[in-house]
Amino acid sequence: MTTRLTFAGYQGEGSVHTRAGRVFCETLKRELGDSIQVDFDENIVQKGHKAAELLSRTESGELDGCYFSSSYLAARVPELGLFDQHFVVPDRQRAYAVLDGALGKRLAQEVEDRTGFTVLGYWDNGVRNISNAHRPIHKPHDCTDMKIRTLDNDNHQRGSDH
């Protein structure tokens, strides 16, 4: 008997997230052989869907799994908002150390308790820095008078009206 697993993401061909999704799916196939068929929809956005739909499609059972930004769950698991704050995590190494430790385990449990999702692991989407083509940004004040695109996330948008 073959088990079918559907997995999806929202990034294009060159994205590190897409490449990581491929590695995940290929690893499952290699480790489980003919007992699994893995279908990876690499970019639902390209097909007219919104990235945030990954969660509802997984909850409904249409998908078995997906990757997504923790920002999409911050309203349901407010503790995830810690990693949405700009200038909070100084570098990747510290972020990995924190997420691979007790806090990462606690966050995974909170996600499961509040949403039913199981966290398989964490990866970075960049330390929450802000980049632009105009000037360096080192502290929040450096963003004055700039238009900045954000996710639909209160932590990202807080203060944007000042």
Region locations from a protein language model:
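A generic structural signal for well-ordered alpha-helical segments enriched in polar/charged residues
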Residues: 23-30, 34, 109
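Charged, low-complexity surface patches
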Residues: 17, 46-47, 100, 149
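Short, well-ordered beta-strand elements
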Residues: 2-17, 21-25, 36-41, 145-149
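Contiguous mixed-secondary-structure segments that line small-molecule binding/active-site clefts
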Residues: 26, 52, 56, 64-65, ...
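Active-site charged/polar residues at nucleotide-handling catalytic sites that mediate phosphoryl
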Residues: 61
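Short, well-ordered coil loops that connect the C-terminus of an alpha-helix to the N-terminus
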Residues: 34-35, 117
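Extracytoplasmic small-molecule ligand-binding "clamshell" domains
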Residues: 30-31, 37-58
